């Protein structure tokens, strides 16, 4: 059986850059196929409608809906429209979602969710953020989410839904993930060296804190001379988080203890810990 996995990418968060790639890292899985429909950078109604129309036409077994602030009207409307068409949805979004009144409704709903607390909003002030700064920030953030283990936990949660479809479940019978990616959850089981573990955990805590600094710089501070250094400091925080992650991974390399968990062609997840060995 080939499982059809849809990815509806609405706007951008770092997790959305990697969503489908985490499921098929070498593009050789034979048990699944993915289709991504994107609204581009914006969340306008016409952009959302285009994504929903294309996704319904493809007819996935389930759909991953990735967006910032998952309780905004656009992302909320998209998943509700897909659900009405009989397509189960897993929401991947940032921690801003949990600060809104609608969070309780999402938790109690039929939708799955993965809240990436470390996937913090960018410092979106024109005086600071140009295309290169944007790309640099996302590169640092992707490294933090990768090395801490947050992306692995996200990938496994989605793989488990694929496994259920392969086992014959569908629609409302699917057990969808309901996961809040805290620092403890992200780093769990990822490191053998306790100092590497501590560095990675510190990195994720810093990455989470970046959101609050950028909220202050983007929405709570007037005057470019005041808000520009605030958002710049948030980006420096993310860079330091990335450097901590690099240090943690190098420590694991030094003792030949980097954990690798690739997919086989049939989607089975295997694992290895020493570099010169076969995954089992």
UniProtKB/Swiss-Prot annotation:
Gene3D superfamilies: 6.10.140.120, F420-dependent methylenetetrahydromethanopterin dehydrogenase (MTD) (3.40.50.10830)
Sorted UniProt keywords: Methanogenesis, One-carbon metabolism, Oxidoreductase
Pathway: One-carbon metabolism; methanogenesis from CO(2); 5,10-methylene-5,6,7,8-tetrahydromethanopterin from 5,10-methenyl-5,6,7,8-tetrahydromethanopterin (coenzyme F420 route): step 1/1
Catalytic reactions on record: 5,10-methylenetetrahydromethanopterin + oxidized coenzyme F420-(gamma-L-Glu)(n) + 2 H(+) = 5,10-methenyl-5,6,7,8-tetrahydromethanopterin + reduced coenzyme F420-(gamma-L-Glu)(n)
Enzyme type, top EC level: oxidoreductase
Top-level taxon of origin: Archaea
Enzyme Commission number: 1.5.98.1
GO annotation (BP), single: methanogenesis, from carbon dioxide
Keyword Oxidoreductase: yes
Single annotated GO MF: methylenetetrahydromethanopterin dehydrogenase activity
Cited InterPro entries: MTD (IPR002844), MTD_sf (IPR036080)
Function: Catalyzes the reversible reduction of methenyl-H(4)MPT(+) to methylene-H(4)MPT.
Protein family: Belongs to the MTD family.
HAMAP family in the cross-refs: MTD
Record protein name field: F420-dependent methylenetetrahydromethanopterin dehydrogenase
The encoding gene: mtd
């Amino acid at each position: 059986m080939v499982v059809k996995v849809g990815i509806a990418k609405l706007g951008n968060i770092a997790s959305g850059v990697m969503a489908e790639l985490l499921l098929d890292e070498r593009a050789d899985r034979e048990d699944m196929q993915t289709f991504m429909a994107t609204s581009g950078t914006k969340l306008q109604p016409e952009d959302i409608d285009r994504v929903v129309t294309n996704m319904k036409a493809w007819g996935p077994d389930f759909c991953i809906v990735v967006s910032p602030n998952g309780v905004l009207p656009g992302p909320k409307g998209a998943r509700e429209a897909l659900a009405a068409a009989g397509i189960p949805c897993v929401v991947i979004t940032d921690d801003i979602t949990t600060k809104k009144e609608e969070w309780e409704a999402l938790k109690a709903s039929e939708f799955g969710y993965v809240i990436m607390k470390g996937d913090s909003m960018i410092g979106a002030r024109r005086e600071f953020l140009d295309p290169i700064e944007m790309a640099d920030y996302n590169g640092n953030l992707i490294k933090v989410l990768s090395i801490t283990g947050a992306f692995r936990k996200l990938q496994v949660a989605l793989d488990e839904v694929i496994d259920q479809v392969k086992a014959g479940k569908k629609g409302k019978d699917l057990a969808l993930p309901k996961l809040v990616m805290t620092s403890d959850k992200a780093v769990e089981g990822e490191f053998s060296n306790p100092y590497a573990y501590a560095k990675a955990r510190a990195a994720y805590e810093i990455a989470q804190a970046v959101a609050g600094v950028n909220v202050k710089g983007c929405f709570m501070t007037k005057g470019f001379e005041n808000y520009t250094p605030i958002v710049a400091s948030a980006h420096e925080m993310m860079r330091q988080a990335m450097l901590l992650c690099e240090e943690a991974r190098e420590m694991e390399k030094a003792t030949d203890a980097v954990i690798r968990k690739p997919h086989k062609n049939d989607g089975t997840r295997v694992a290895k810990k020493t570099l010169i060995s076969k995954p089992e």
